[in-house]
Amino acid sequence: MTRVADFAKDHRVHLLQGAQELFPALIEAMDAALSDIQFETYIFDFTGAGAQVAEALIRAAQRGVRTHLVVDGVGTGPLPKAWQQRMKSAGVQVRVYSPLGPLGLLLPHRWRRLHRKLCVVDGLVVFCGGINVLDDLYDPNYGDLDAPRFDFAVQATGSLAAQASRTMELLWWRMQAVRDVRLNRLPQAVRDLRA
């Protein structure tokens, strides 16, 4: 494990307040992506400003950028069909972390959730913090809000981005291995874990 002090030598950090600062920075980075985008979030809501982030992922995939999106099975739930189709057609690879089965959260092994809010672009820049992909002035359960949410994220460059990228890649392949096991593709699951 890399010590925190090791990161301080080669990284730059910029504090972003709310989605009104985070989303434009995210979109700018994704629009400039050359090789890959890794994105993980608990909530991805496709209303308002969240739709702009989704559009940036689609544009990147259409340019040939490897685009991975992981959303939580409770926080996001099933993606809207229209967005699912658009992302699939564009080449955005989407995985749902621990989707709910017929028994929902009654089974304790379903309580583990993906609360990370991370995006790594080209292994060079990482966005992380407490902000979901959710318009600051809209709540899916309550509608329009009177005031924006108060939350923060950081944009960082340097070795911290590469470390986050490796961690996200590991989750991606673990999820693929679990999927392969469920589909009785054990040899492929073993290969996925070695990737």
Give residue ranges: language-model regions.
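Charged, low-complexity intrinsically disordered terminal segments
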Residues: 1-195
